[in-house]
């Protein structure tokens, strides 16, 4: 029997996080209350501010406190002519970590899934179409996940790009660096063979 209704509420609230079950939530709650109350207060303040102040960029739909995010507002990226389409803001972070992309993004916040009632309008493709029509975009890089839904979404966007005379490309899928061939699944291996590249001498 729980001695504190507030503690019960705290543990239940922590369970909204991905991968956090009852035991993990209990450990987190006790850690904050027993050993790090100041950290708990900072966490509470940061969560409160983030939930109330962070919205979506008017151009790319990623998370930001501003109307336009810093990436979209960067003049060098604006004139680059490249847009990379991703499924979530976390994908932007992953791509930015590579340092290999200097264009702008468009975040779908999901993917097409007719069985779940998710259509083009639900993932902002009307906004992307506006950008294709009004901006000087040279190429759209489709970086949706290599799932059935991700591939369907990429194909749909590629057809939109074709309508507006904009080049569309798909990120490569293949064997991970450092991976062993025998451990790679058949689908990935098929993509690797189909997307093989010649040596350049």
Swiss-Prot record:
A zinc finger (C4-type) spans 57-72. CDD domains: TOPRIM_recR. InterPro entries: DNA_Rcmb_RecR, Rcmb_RecR, Rcmb_RecR_Znf, TOPRIM_dom, TOPRIM_RecR. PROSITE patterns: RECR (PS01300), TOPRIM (PS50880). Keywords: DNA damage, DNA recombination, DNA repair, Metal-binding, Zinc, Zinc-finger. It holds the Pfam family Toprim_4. Residues 81-176 form the Toprim domain. One of its GO terms (biological process) is DNA repair. Disulfide bonds: none annotated. The keyword DNA repair applies. SMART domains: TOPRIM. One of its GO terms (molecular function) is zinc ion binding. SUPFAM superfamilies: Recombination protein RecR. Belongs to the RecR family. May play a role in DNA repair. It seems to be involved in an RecBC-independent recombinational process of DNA repair. It may act with RecF and RecO. This is Recombination protein RecR.
């Amino acid at each position: 029997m729980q001695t504190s209704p507030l503690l019960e509420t705290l543990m239940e609230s922590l369970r909204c996080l991905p991968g956090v079950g009852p035991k993990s939530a209990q450990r987190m709650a006790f850690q904050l209350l027993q050993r790090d109350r100041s950290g708990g207060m900072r966490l509470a303040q940061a969560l409160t501010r983030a939930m109330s102040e962070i919205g979506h960029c008017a151009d790319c739909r990623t998370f930001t406190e501003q109307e336009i995010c810093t990436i979209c507002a960067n003049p060098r990226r604006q004139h680059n002519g490249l847009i990379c389409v991703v499924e979530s803001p976390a994908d932007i972070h992953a791509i930015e970590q590579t340092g290999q992309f200097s264009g702008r993004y468009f975040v779908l916040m999901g993917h097409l899934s007719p069985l779940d009632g998710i259509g083009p309008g639900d993932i902002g493709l009307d906004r992307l179409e506006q950008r294709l029509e009004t901006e000087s975009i040279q190429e759209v890089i489709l970086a949706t996940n290599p799932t059935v839904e991700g591939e369907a979404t990429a194909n749909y966007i590629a057809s939109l790009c074709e309508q507006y005379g904009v080049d569309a490309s798909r990120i490569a899928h293949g064997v991970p660096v450092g991976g062993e061939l025998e451990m790679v699944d058949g689908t990935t291996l098929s993509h690797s063979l189909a997307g093989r590249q010649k040596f350049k001498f």
